[in-house]
Structure formats: structure tokens, C-alpha cells
Amino acid sequence: MDEVMEVMEKKYDDSEFGVQELADALGLNRSVLSKKLAAETGLPTAQFIRNYRLDIAKRMIIDNVANRNITEIAYRVGFNDPKYFTRCFTKQYGVSPSSFKDTQEEES
């Protein structure tokens, strides 16, 4: 799992980075990677990658990284469609990224 996290830290911001690229970086085929990752995390590989990106985005919002707007954050964490990012973030955290950002700003 350490190797997976090392690769994720280096590649999460690349919008072209996905399941196949993770498998290639680890020297595994997709099937083996999927089985190993599911055993460790309980998640399909694509969802693991997406959740990793969403966690980084959430931290960026909390840390108010360079006053970035939501679209900039979406691109920064490897999403190439800000609307899809918003849908994923809302599904994951139960609140839109904009609302989450507003809440963080109010608490500051």
C-alpha cells in the first residue's frame, strides 16, 4: 500500500492518470491491482483514485491554498471537468465544494 500512496502523491494531479497508469507504475496488471486494492481499501481502483483526489481538494479548500477558486482546485487535483468534480465532491461529503468553502471562510 505504501507504493500505491507514493505513486498517488506524485501523479494525482495528472488528469490523464487513471487505473491503467497506476497499474503500470506499480508493474501490475489492472486485475491484480484491483484485487489487491479492493482487499486493502474495500474500494474499486477508480473510486480509490477519485477519493484520493477529493481528499486533497478538501484539504486545499480548508487550507485556502492561494485563494484558489473551486474550478482551479478541480483542475489542480486532476479533474478535467469542474462540474464532474462538484458532483463527486457533493456525493462524497454531502455538501457542494462551494458551500464547503463558504463554511470554511465563515469559520476563519
PLM regions: where:
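Inter-domain helical "communication" segments and dimerization helices
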Residues: M1-D14, D24, D102-S108
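…primarily DNA-binding HTH/wHTH and HhH modules…
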Residues: R87-S108
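Terminal helix-turn-helix DNA-binding modules in bacterial transcription factors
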Residues: A39-N80, D102-S108
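Basic, amphipathic alpha-helical hairpins
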Residues: M5-F17, L37, T41, R59-R68, ...
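Extended hydrophobic-aromatic, low-complexity segments
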Residues: S15-Q20, S34, T45-F48
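Append "Primarily bacterial transcriptional regulators
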Residues: Q20-L28, L33, L37, T71-N80, ...
